[in-house]
Structure formats: C-alpha cells, structure tokens
Amino acid sequence: MGQAYDALPSEVYKDGELKGKIKRLMGLAAALTHGCRACILFQTEEALKLGASVDEVLETCAVAISIGGTMAAGETTRVVQFLGEKGLV
C-alpha cells in the first residue's frame, strides 16, 4: 500500500489527456483555494519546470481567486513573491 501511495503523484501528474503542466496549474489553483502554503510553492515550481509561463501561472491565480475569493487572493501574494525571488516578475 505504501509503495502505491508513493507512486501516486508521478502517475497523476504525468502527461495523459492533459499535459503535466496543466495538471500542475490545476494543482496550484486547488492549493490557492485551500490555503496550502507548501503546496502553492511546490505546484508553482513544478509548473514552471514543465514549461508554464509566468502569464499562465498568474492566469491560474486569477481563476483561483474567482473560485476562492479573498483567501485565494491573499495566497496569490505568495506566488508573486516566489516569482519575484526567482527574478521572473
């Protein structure tokens, strides 16, 4: 059971009908609406590694804000700060 659980992320986020990049952006939107700080940074980093542009990341943040309201808006500042630290904005 433990091995199957450990393998889950690599299976879920690999390219399928949806590209891994899109899945990571979806994960970012979910993390923003749930306020999971570590997840927000992790999903942002992984999406960038898979070729997401800064504009795609920020558009994902906008979608999350439309769903999660002020909580997602507040958490979006973490993404902007992270992108700034990477010299991307």
Question: Where would I find each of the regions flagged by the language model?
Answer:
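Amphipathic alpha-helical segments within well-ordered protein domains
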Residues: 9-10, 27, 44-48, 62
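Iron-sulfur (Fe-S) cluster-binding segments and ferredoxin-like electron-carrier domains
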Residues: 2-4, 42-54, 80
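Immediate flanking context of iron-sulfur cluster ligation sites
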Residues: 17-34, 55-60
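Short cysteine clusters
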Residues: 36-39
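A short structural micro-motif
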Residues: 32, 63-70
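Short, flexible active-site-proximal loops enriched in glycine and acidic residues
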Residues: 51-58, 72-73
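Acidic, glycine/proline-rich low-complexity segments that act as flexible tails and inter-domain linkers
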Residues: 1-22, 72-89
